[in-house]
Amino acid sequence: MKSVVIQQPNELVIEERQLPVPGAGDVRVSIKLAGICGSDSHIYRGHNPFAKYPRVIGHEFFGVIDAVGEGVDSARLGQRVSVDPVISCGHCYPCSVGKPNVCTSLVVLGVHRDGGFSEYAVVPAQNAWPIPDDIPDKHAVMVEPFTIAANVTGQAKPTEQDVALIYGAGPMGLVTVQALKGVYQVKQVIVVDRIDERLAMARRSGADWVFNNGEQSLQAALEEKGIKPTLIIDAACHPSILQEAITLASPAARIVLMGFSNEPSQIVQQGITGKELAIFSSRLNANKFPVVIDWLKRGLIDPEKLITHTFDYHHVKDAIELFEKDQRQCCKVLLTFGQ
C-alpha cells in the first residue's frame, strides 16, 4: 500500500508499505477520503511538539472496513466509517470523568501513531464509527472537524439567548459558527477575522455579523452597538486575545480557548473575578463522534460550505502548500484515496 510519510520536518514522501493486518480488537479501513488540518501542516513543518518521526499524518479520515481482527464482529466488514483519532486508556482520572481527549496516556492517530493519509489504516474497532447510508462520503470525512465544535459547545453550553463572539474564521471557527446557529439556534453570532474572504465564508456558515479587526477597533464597534458578548470563543489562538475577551465580555459570560500557543498571555485577574467569568479550554473531542453524526442525519450542519478543494493524494504536497498559503480562497482541503 502507499502511505504519505513525513520522514522528518519538511521531508514528505509517498512510501510503499506492507499492508497492515488488524490485531485483536482492531479493524482495517480502506481509506476513501481524508482532510488536511493545520496540525498536519505543523507536523510537516516541524512545529508540532507532540509528533514523532517518521509519521503517517492525517487524523480526519473516512473509508470502508475491509478486514477485522480477533474479537470484532465480521458483520462490520463493508461498513462505511469515520475514525475518531483519540485513543485513550479508559482508566485514568480524565477518562473516569468523561475526558478521554486529555487521557494521561493519550494517543492521537496521525500525531503519536500513524494516521489516515494512507491507502489503508488499522484502528481500534471502537474508534471506527458507522456512517448512515444517506450521509455522503464528503460529509462523512468532515465528522472529525465538527467534533471540535461539539466539544467546544459541550463545554460552553450555548443558549438561544447568547450573544456569541468568535475570534477566527478558519475551519475551526467556521464549524463552530455552524454548530452555534444550526444546532443551538444562538440568536446572534459575531465573527472577527482580518481576512475579508474568510469573513464571507463565516457569513455563508450563518454568522449574523462579521468584523475585520485589522481595519478598526473591535472594542469600539461593540461599544457603539451596545453589545456585551455572553459567549466568546477563541479559534485564532493569539496571546493578545484572552485579555481582550475578558475586557469585552458581559458579566457572567463564558470564554472558551481552542488550540495551542506557547506565547504568554498577560491578563488582569480582577477582570475575571469582577465579572465572575467562566474560562474553559477545549482540546480534540471527548466522545463527540455520535453527536456530530446525529447532527448530520438531522441536517443541522452543512460541511459542503467549508470544502473548497479536493486533490488526489499523489498531489498531497501541492494540497498542503495551497492550504498553508491561500487563506483567502482555501478552507477545507480533501485528499482522495482508492478512487
Describe each model-derived feature in a short phrase.
Residues 3-21, 38-67, 82-83, 100-114:
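N-terminal glycine-rich cofactor-binding segment
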Residues 20-34, 47-93, 132-134:
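Glycine-rich beta-strand-centered segment in the early N-terminal region that forms part
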Residues 78, 161, 207, 228-230, ...:
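Local beta-strand N-terminus motif with an aromatic residue
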Residues 89-167:
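NAD(P)H dinucleotide-binding glycine-rich loop of Rossmann-like/cofactor-binding domains
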Residues 135-215:
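Mid-domain Rossmann-like dinucleotide-binding core that forms the NAD(H)/NADP(H) cofactor-binding site
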Residues 156, 200-278:
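Glycine-rich cofactor phosphate-binding loops and adjacent beta1-alpha1 units
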Residues 192-194, 235, 283:
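N-terminal Rossmann-fold cofactor-binding loop
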Residues 196, 243-247, 286, 290-339:
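C-terminal hydrophobic helical "lid"/dimerization subdomain
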